[in-house]
Amino acid sequence: MADLLGSILSSMEKPPTVHDQESRRKAREQAARLKKLEEDERRKKAEFRKKMEKEVSEFIKDSTLQKKKYNPMGKIERSILHDVAEVAGLTSFSFGEDEESRYVMLFKKEFAPSDEELEAYRKGEEWDPQKAEERRRLKEKAALEEEAASHTQKRPASPNSNYRDKYSHLIGTSAAKDAAHTLQANRAYGCVPVANKRDTRSIEEAMNEIRAKKRQKKGDEEAAGSGSSV
């Protein structure tokens, strides 16, 4: 009986010691602090969102502004600002090399940044529209010059140039130029000067006329001889 009573008493929960009471008290205090921190965090986020909504609204109403740059802020704040901007119909980007320097820029939809402008911000550079326009003009000019040079290289050399370059060291530049002009103008005659062909035909005609006259003269003389002998 005594053994049974002793077993029952030993199985019963022992009253907490002073150490256990202190541990439970600290646990309750820690839970209360965590709850308070969470409530403070929610309150701060709500206040920050409300502040950003007001600033974004003012930015949209100001027709003189195209973009708005914020100071560096934490990841949570950047996330809230991006969300507010999206709801308001704005375009937003984060820039900065590290977490400490990252910031947010807002852009109105009608003034969305170009790829060149975004690249400048990513490099940590200031965007200058005038300098960018000058670089664009120079780039276009260089492209046009390169295209013109390419067409010039592909263009075949003219007969004038070939003839002039080939024979200028023998007959002189002026003579070569005149000869090239003559050949170009009279290509239908097999590149032989037209004057030579005209002269040749005139001589042949003249010789035929001379032969005909000689034959006629000889015939006249023979006729005259026959008449005198009779």
UniProtKB/Swiss-Prot annotation:
<dbReference type="Pfam" id="PF01424">
    <property type="entry name" value="R3H"/>
</dbReference>
<dbReference type="GO" id="GO:0003676">
    <property type="term" value="F:nucleic acid binding"/>
</dbReference>
<feature type="compositionally biased region" description="Basic and acidic residues">
    <location>
        <begin position="16"/>
        <end position="45"/>
    </location>
</feature>
<dbReference type="InterPro" id="IPR001374">
    <property type="entry name" value="R3H_dom"/>
</dbReference>
<feature type="region of interest" description="Disordered">
    <location>
        <begin position="185"/>
        <end position="230"/>
    </location>
</feature>
<feature type="modified residue" description="Phosphoserine">
    <location>
        <position position="158"/>
    </location>
</feature>
<feature type="compositionally biased region" description="Basic and acidic residues">
    <location>
        <begin position="196"/>
        <end position="211"/>
    </location>
</feature>
<protein>
    <recommendedName>
        <fullName>Sperm-associated antigen 7 homolog</fullName>
    </recommendedName>
</protein>
<feature type="domain" description="R3H">
    <location>
        <begin position="46"/>
        <end position="109"/>
    </location>
</feature>
<feature type="compositionally biased region" description="Basic and acidic residues">
    <location>
        <begin position="119"/>
        <end position="144"/>
    </location>
</feature>
<dbReference type="InterPro" id="IPR036867">
    <property type="entry name" value="R3H_dom_sf"/>
</dbReference>
<keyword id="KW-0597">Phosphoprotein</keyword>
<dbReference type="InterPro" id="IPR017330">
    <property type="entry name" value="SPAG7"/>
</dbReference>
<feature type="region of interest" description="Disordered">
    <location>
        <begin position="119"/>
        <end position="169"/>
    </location>
</feature>
<dbReference type="InterPro" id="IPR034068">
    <property type="entry name" value="R3H_sperm-antigen"/>
</dbReference>
<feature type="region of interest" description="Disordered">
    <location>
        <begin position="1"/>
        <end position="45"/>
    </location>
</feature>
